[in-house]
């Protein structure tokens, strides 16, 4: 844009600047800032997930259990590490994350699988605070480094914890007939259609 404006100012070209952003390209292209802020997290191919989960289930430590829970529930790191016993209904096998802890600001309900329930049972045996995965020194949530260190121990420096959400999304899209709307709801993503989102009241 600057180069063409310079040429136009020196009358080396005429007809306006086709690369002008304001009032021109801004009307048809996404904001450069949005593209700059968008990050892609390295993910494990879903074909390798069964083997990975088998190894992870045999790995000791709270970090390993937290990572398992994060993968099984397709939650964000902060959501899983901040999980409280008061949010979990063991009888009905549902984990309800309050809107205050959700990125989209909307309460998120997650049905708990048998594997997730097993992890909760293991953590309940060593319960020391209201947090499911507490820092043993102060009772607060364990740090993000806990799960990342597990990946390093398992020699998976090439992937990130957040990347497992992409693994989940890829599997659902390529191996199931699950509607996109349901998959997005499982990831607690906001509906793209603002009018539809305004009337959204249920879990799906």
Regions found by a protein language model. Name each.
Residues 6, 10, 153, 171, ...:
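Active-site catalytic microenvironments for nucleophilic, acid-base chemistry
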Residues 96-105, 117, 139, 174-177, ...:
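Catalytic-site neighborhood detector that most strongly recognizes the C-terminal catalytic loop/helix
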Residues 62-68, 72-79, 142, 146, ...:
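C-terminal catalytic core of tyrosine-transesterase DNA break-rejoin enzymes
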Residues 43-50, 92, 101, 111-159, ...:
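Active-site/catalytic core of tyrosine-dependent DNA strand-transfer enzymes
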Residues 1-7, 112:
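Non-catalytic DNA-binding core/recognition domains of DNA-processing enzymes
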Residues 9-83, 91, 102-106, 126-127, ...:
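Basic, Lys/Arg- and aromatic-enriched nucleic-acid-binding interface segment
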């Amino acid at each position: 844009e600057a180069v063409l404006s310079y040429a136009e100012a020196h009358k080396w070209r005429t007809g306006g600047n086709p690369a002008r952003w304001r009032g021109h390209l801004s009307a048809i292209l996404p904001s450069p800032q949005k593209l700059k802020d968008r990050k892609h997290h390295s993910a494990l191919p879903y074909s390798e997930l069964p083997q990975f989960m088998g190894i992870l289930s045999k790995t000791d430590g709270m970090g390993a259990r937290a990572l398992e829970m994060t993968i099984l529930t397709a939650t964000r790191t902060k959501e899983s590490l901040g999980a409280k016993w008061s949010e979990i209904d063991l009888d009905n096998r549902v984990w309800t994350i309050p809107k205050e802890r959700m990125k989209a600001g909307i309460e998120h309900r997650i049905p708990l699988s048998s594997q997730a329930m097993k992890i909760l049972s293991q953590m309940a045996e060593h319960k020391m605070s209201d947090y499911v995965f507490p820092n043993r020194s102060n009772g607060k949530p364990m740090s993000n480094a806990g799960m990342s260190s597990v990946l390093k121990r398992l020699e998976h420096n090439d992937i990130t914890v957040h990347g497992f959400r992409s693994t989940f999304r890829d599997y659902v899209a390529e191996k199931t007939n699950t509607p996109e709307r349901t998959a997005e709801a499982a990831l607690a993503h906001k509906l793209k259609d603002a009018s539809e989102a305004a009337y959204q009241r249920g879990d799906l």
